[in-house]
Amino acid sequence: PVLALGLTKLIKPSRKIDETNINITNSWLSVNNWLIDQVLPQLKWHISVEDGLDLNLQGRYLMTCNHQSWVDTTVAQYFGLTRMPLTRFFTKWELIFIPFVGQAFKILGFPMMKRHTKAQIAKNPELKYRDLEEARKSCQQLLSQPFTLLNYLEGTRFSPEKHAKQQSPYQNLLKPKAGGLALALNILENEIDAL
């Protein structure tokens, strides 16, 4: 349904289509959360929210998270489903080629980033600015609706190999990369209700 509505959005953009897609996605996430509760009934969640932080489904939030495993996004969605707007996060452009998943990311307004190597940027410095412009446009598109934008400060999932290669000063974390967060704050700073 999300993809079909997304195609109609190409012909005639509509806030109603966006809202319907969000509702469909939230229904799917509700089923996912129910499945998690069934498969892991003894799971104990320890999630803390800053005192006085008033989260709501109509808010605009920027969320940061360490990226320990592929489960991180599932946990963020589980936590946020009834507390915050749909959680979106920066994704790799290459995911657009995964049938259904990549297209759903695009339709739902997930900011998609192309990754360029240092060698590619050195050869063509414009690539760096082109990607920043795409990220800026993606962030600005979020402003037409309530949103939660998740930023993994480490930029990639933790692994012992990456940790050793980076010589991270942190025991269980990679070195943070502030670029994505700085970009989002720069674009959204006056529009977010909480970080």
Question: Where are the model-predicted features located?
Answer:
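Membrane-anchoring hydrophobic helices of lipid-metabolizing enzymes
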Residues: 1-61, 75
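Soluble catalytic domains of membrane acyltransferases
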Residues: 39-195
